[in-house]
Amino acid sequence: MADIHNDPFALTGLTYDDVLLLPELTDVVPSEVDTSAQLTKKIRLRIPLLSAAMDTVTEARMAIAMARQGGIGILHRNLSIEEQASQVRQVKRSESGMVEDPVTIGPDATIEELDQLCGHYRVSGLPVVDDDQQLIGIITNRDLRFVPTDQWASLKVRDCMTPRERLVTGKVGTSREEAKALLATNRVEKLPIIDEDGRLTGLITVKDFVKTEQYPNATKDERGRLMVGAAVGYWGDTWERACALRDAGVDVLVVDTANGGAALALEMIRKIKADPTFDGVQIIGGNVATTEGAQALIDAGVDAVKVGVGPGSICTTRVVAGVGVPQVTAIHLASLACKPAGVPLIADGGLQYSGDIGKAIVAGADTVMLGSLLAGCEESPGEVVFTNGKQYKRYRGMGSLGAMSSRGRKSYSKDRYFQADVSSDDKIVPEGIEGQVPYTGALAAVVYQLVGGLHQTMFYLGASTIDAVKRNGRFVRITSAGLRESHPHDVQMTTEAPNYHSSAK
């Protein structure tokens, strides 16, 4: 390769629409391939997909849905520290082998307070404990079935709960199989675990067994809880935020900036990695688009490198700042540092179709991060809007004016674009736009099509694993005529396929 420092025109930048993959001889069956991939040095996903840390893409509901499908969600940081940590706890509590620190309620709380607590944590009932954490009962929606709602403000939990003497309980050390047998034999949905003194130490629910069977590929930690990541910055309260997220049980922290090679971002990564209290948390750094940028993150100690400067559909960095690298080339350049170091690479942004996932992997990625492809899902936090009788969901870049503006609250995305010191909203220089994407329904259906497309890629390449995709894949560059030929052409499309939308062309 020519020295791009001496010859500014030596390097050609290619993106997904500039290349196709060559078909290979194959005996691979699409339904039998293994799509598992390394997210970080220590975390392996069953599918190589992450949902982006954007305020119209990933909050707790999306993170739960992504983990159940075998990927992982990265919670955005345009939230207060308390809100972001609370969302981490929501994900970790949503499913587990045993809830070791269950949410509880006191006997003198009102039913109205119980309802608010259950709604916040998305649970159907709570154990009732006294001031000494002694289990004195349990209250679920069964107990409230015939209680008029107009009495909820005055009725106490003790008036409606199932008392301790009527409960089925388990002892500390009860195995999963024993718990399942107790639940089935007694036809109950919740099994409180108590110690010798009658204190509540955990809670096992029948829903966790059902969810395990329903989502066999779910991404879980060693305690059977769904895994979740969260974004942090490098400025202001970042250290306090990182500590709060660690204490809430986060599995992955993403030091997320528009230029991962910035000194302040690298310094924050080194600070987190040097603290032994973060040994159980994997650290991802980004974003970069060059070999040097990736190497700087690796030298700082990251467990994965995130690649992408300006490829997103809502990003304007490349035209506002004139900086960026087309994504396929960016992935390749970063992989020149990541591969020898054994550090996984995440391709972030620019994907329009399922076929782009395979292209990213052949270029050097291990996993891909998705924004616009997931923003239209039911589980995304974006607002639903109607335009000309069709449903859409709002989608915006974290560098958009709306995401960066304070509007009466503190904005946490300004520092991602190194504008944390901007004194007022009218001085912000946006690097993104606000828009909308078609409503696409449940995440599970969208992921099925995306992963199904990857299965087909692996079939065509004769690759039964993600590593084999990297080994077998070969690119061919195409012209604008070749791109036109690749899409449906010379016909009026009457019915859109679930995995192809003409609006993305």
What function would you assign to each model-found segment?
Residues 61-64, 240-248, 289-307, 347, ...:
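Catalytic cores of alpha/beta
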Residues 44-51, 97-102, 221-231, 273-289, ...:
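Short beta-strand/loop segments at the ligand-binding rim of alpha/beta enzyme cores
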Residues 31, 80-89, 149-154, 199-219, ...:
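Active-site-adjacent beta->alpha loops and helix N-cap segments on the catalytic face
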Residues 68-83, 250-262, 303-321, 351-385:
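Glycine-rich phosphate-binding active-site loops on the catalytic face of alpha/beta enzymes
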Residues 75-78, 104, 125-127, 147, ...:
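Catalytic beta/alpha-barrel core
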